[in-house]
């Protein structure tokens, strides 16, 4: 049995009931086998893989708060501080009923490689709670956020751990969290990113992940003598990542014909009218089906199956494991040529393999959606220097980072004889920087 197989079996045995974490570790270790085999004894002697797959610290705490009826509610809060070899922990907070330790470990593990790929000095972490902000009043959300931060503030800081938003944590929640941190600690520091522009936030942060996904796609296409102009897109999801991926794709000449939310999907053969989607999702906080009521010629379909629509480019920007093998087979049969992940691990392992084996150019989320955390790190830099860059400056830096990530993944894949295997390339490139830092810092 190889070293990578031994480590994977150990992960499964020691972390039962955490399938997302197992999946993330397997994908990375499978890619790294060609690297590890070249110098297995050194990696074994320092237990580098065992340390790489084990979080440095997992924090769990209760979050009591009072709802609008005066009833005390109790939720669970978590922070997985996965790896700080190349910088302070950095990664989002997710407020959603599905949140548990296993999902946060998978996200923190992925975040470690993603942050490494940006070239910026940030380690990997992830946190959140099983609290659901949907259907809660502003006062209830504030009460929860203040209680969460009262405990959470003990473990974070501008040079220790700098969280950001994620699913269920937007500008409102970040504001409440930052206010409570400042109140408790008496410090006005860049301890959170995704802040409002009036109190230390960065321009382009909201758009960054979605824009970055399309910048990555553009670079892949250029490498294959192709372009976005005139291509037909499907973009799953209708949150920040999806909306701004659509915006940038349309700016570069793409035609987006379908989007979705957790209830179903819309199809507009004339091209999605993004201003209407923004009004529904960002202003009214409504459901995507309202689009079909407002746009003549558009249709709404309940449930899944958005991949049945023909497209050249498929951008999964909703949630983990949304695209399974059946969907991948349909995409291939319909002539899809590019799949670039906007969400974290939205494609199952067997679907990823099928897409790659059938000539689809596939870029994993740890590379493609790194624009969000990269711009968070740029926000940290602005906070440290007490500066505020223009939107054009931030966007130019974001674009440069995404181009650089593509070339890191592309070069690593070619170096190991796996041209166009961007999954392996991204994993190898991210791994090399982290593991070099771990070696230099000794057994810790």
Could you say what each language-model-derived stretch is?
Residues 19-22, 38-45, 119, 156-165, ...:
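Flexible, glycine/charged-enriched surface loops at secondary-structure junctions
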Residues 59, 64-122, 126, 130:
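Phosphate-interaction motifs
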Residues 2-24, 220-221, 332-444:
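Adenosine-phosphate binding glycine-rich loop
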Residues 41-71:
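Structured beta-strand/loop patches that form or line metal/cofactor-binding pockets in enzymes
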Residues 193-196, 201-308:
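Glycine-rich phosphate/diphosphate-binding loop of Rossmann-like nucleotide-binding domains
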Residues 96, 115-229:
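Glycine/serine-rich phosphate-binding loop and adjoining beta1-alpha1 elements at the start
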Residues 264-362, 367:
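Rossmann-like adenosine-cofactor binding region
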